Amino acid sequence: MDSLNSLKGRNLTMLVDFYEMTMANGYLKNGMGDTVAYFDMFFRKVPDGGGYVIMAGVEQLCEYLKGLKFTPEDIEYLRGKGFSEEFLDYLADFKFSCDVYAVPEGTPIFPGEPIVTVKGPIMQAQFVETMVLLCINHQSLIATKANRIVRAAQGRPIMEFGSRRAQGFDAAIYGARAAYIGGCAGTACAVSDIMFGVPALGTMAHSWVQLFDTELKAFCAYAREYPDNCVLLVDTYNALKSGVPNAIEAFKRELLPRGYRPKGIRFDSGDIAYLSRKARKMLDEAGFEDCTIVASNSLDEYLIRDMIGQGAKVDSFGVGERLITSSSSPVLGGVYKLCAVEKDGKICPRIKISDNVAKISTPCFKKPWRLFDRETGKAIADLVTLNNEVVDDTKPYELFDPDFTWKRKIVENYVAKPLTVQLFKDGECVYECPPLDEVKKHCAEQIDTLWDEVLRFDNPHNYYVDLSQKLWDEKQRLLAEHGKKDEQ
């Protein structure tokens, strides 16, 4: 299992977009290889038209950065691509030396704010772009989808069932991890239990029932083998005419005489709202009021919400491909942009300009903050400042919309907390990733700090990410400077 044990045992140093190599070689040849640069990762749009994203993938990013090393085979490959010997010598002696900051896993994050910041020699800070985006984009997407589904279930457990339809085995493994962060109770993916401690759950498939001469024999055999965790799949033939009655009979024959109670039955097809109501009545009349009903079958947050609204008697849900692929909105479009460079001992901001206002980047070495109401504990807004600014929460603070600056609000009686923590200092990991159960708990606690309006599935309230006055002024200065250059 070592070969799959998270990122350990796999050298993914060369998992880069090829232009990282061409740029790094070019920086070195132009005498710019040691220029200190600052990059931010951020995203512009929430998947599914939602109100928030859940940060995930930080642990895997740390593992990747700790393991950066170019092998002789890597060097030979790049030599064959025509890169300079000077560049290849640099890679042969490569040692990561950047500072890295990130929002902790399980924290809600919002468009426009820096969620990962990398500071270091331009060759290194540029080189890690692909894996920064890959680690964070994928797991944050799945954690967010899982959290939406969990909230739709209104306290009923959600099990992640999507491994077989994930887009590759890494997507299955890390998707199960991310789904657990988002609030799922467990996974069908056994290797994620081995690697991360995500509880592995599962009982039977239709093939179990089909293999036996009769459905009743199949149920009785399973009940004998797993009396303390007996969940029977009842829709192989006819759920209400044979499946549920045979399950009840198997419970009576195999479990009750041995002092066990049934764990549940599962539906994987049909009109589950209708079937579950009928099955609940049948189970209750047979004395199995404590027998749970599990539903699966291409579910998502909208179907689960509708089923509950229609009176479905379902106690837990198994959710597969629509979770593990986030099929309704399958991409978190995180980007990685240069925001500053050091020159003559000073940090000089850089900006990316576009005709599309939404794609104009925010310059400077920055720090994101979250402002909480002292009385309610609810998040008021996020604030992005220059890195050396301190938000004094003993004083009123004027927030303003960075695009529509006449929209202003003075906040008082609030607590300001920095959003990011330092992961690496001078290339050494200084952050201890918390256990996954703690990350999951942190996620649930932080979601509770968001107003219900932000959590709506449809047309959620726009949670504000504002800029400090100093940062906004610097952005406007750069825009004006570039505007003058264009006129010349």
Predicted regions and their residues:
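N-terminal, Lys/Arg-enriched amphipathic/low-complexity engagement segments
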Residues: G33, A37-A92
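Gly/Ser/Thr/Ala-enriched C-terminal appendages of enzymes
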Residues: D2-T35, D48-G50, D284-A286, L299-Q488
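A residue-level signal for beta-strand positions that form part of recognition/binding surfaces
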Residues: Y38-D40, S97, I158, V335, ...
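Short, positively charged
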Residues: G80-L88, G168, K395-D403
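Hydrophobic residues within beta-strands of alpha/beta enzymes
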Residues: L201, I265, I293, D315-F317
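Short coil/turn segments at secondary-structure boundaries
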Residues: E76-Y77, T144-R148, G162, L455-N462
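Buried, small/hydrophobic-residue-enriched core segments of structured protein domains
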Residues: D2-V36, K45-P47, G82, L88-V100, ...
